[in-house]
């Protein structure tokens, strides 16, 4: 009865688990879904200029964004030989977090010869946001994973300030649990406010895009991506190889969310063309 009562809300853990399998016809489909609040999974779509049999699904949030104290965990499992595209129907808003930080963890498992695309729209960071984003990939032989982690800044009318911090960890593992590649980003509002040349400058949107897979023509991919992104307006891009022969990474910094989205679509279309021979259309969202 006399125990100390904290004024802070309890950490809230919410999970969605979605698995994909390949039908005898060759088409990929959702074979398992455990999706609770705030996640909502739309029906499986077949979209023009996608590879034959690819399953495209969109995740949405019913809560209006990410809030202080939340811990969201999304688990996507692409079975052997599946082709899967997962995105979001809209950008996710990370609201001001005065009491506690929030964490969003995404686990991607791509089994043998699977193609898994996890390409959500950028997270919108409000003033005083404190968010940790983590993406963990398990890569099986012959699998290909496209993934993106992106954010942009927004100050609603009548408010002021910058995000407290944004941290992103992207890690790629073998089926045995060996770390193949890792990428870490940590930035604070104070860093952004300084507008340092070579760090952020005047740019307010940033993304990391990766193609993860072994046995890829890395040098050809690097050259093609650099040529594709060379003349993108209002953006600065860098392309590099990941260690342990597990793919390529693209870092994009843009003036705003529109420029960032344009650059990311070009990177995605370039890689999809190289992998499947088909370039995707711009998606309406």
Curated annotation (Swiss-Prot):
Pfam families (UniProt xref): UreD
UniProt keywords, alphabetically: Chaperone, Cytoplasm, Nickel insertion
Coiled-coil segments: none
Compartment(s) of residence: Cytoplasm
GO molecular function, one term: nickel cation binding
GO cellular component: a single term: cytoplasm
Biological role: Required for maturation of urease via the functional incorporation of the urease nickel metallocenter.
Family the UniProt entry places it in: Belongs to the UreD family.
Subunit composition and interactions: UreD, UreF and UreG form a complex that acts as a GTP-hydrolysis-dependent molecular chaperone, activating the urease apoprotein by helping to assemble the nickel containing metallocenter of UreC. The UreE protein probably delivers the nickel.
Record's protein name: Urease accessory protein UreD 1
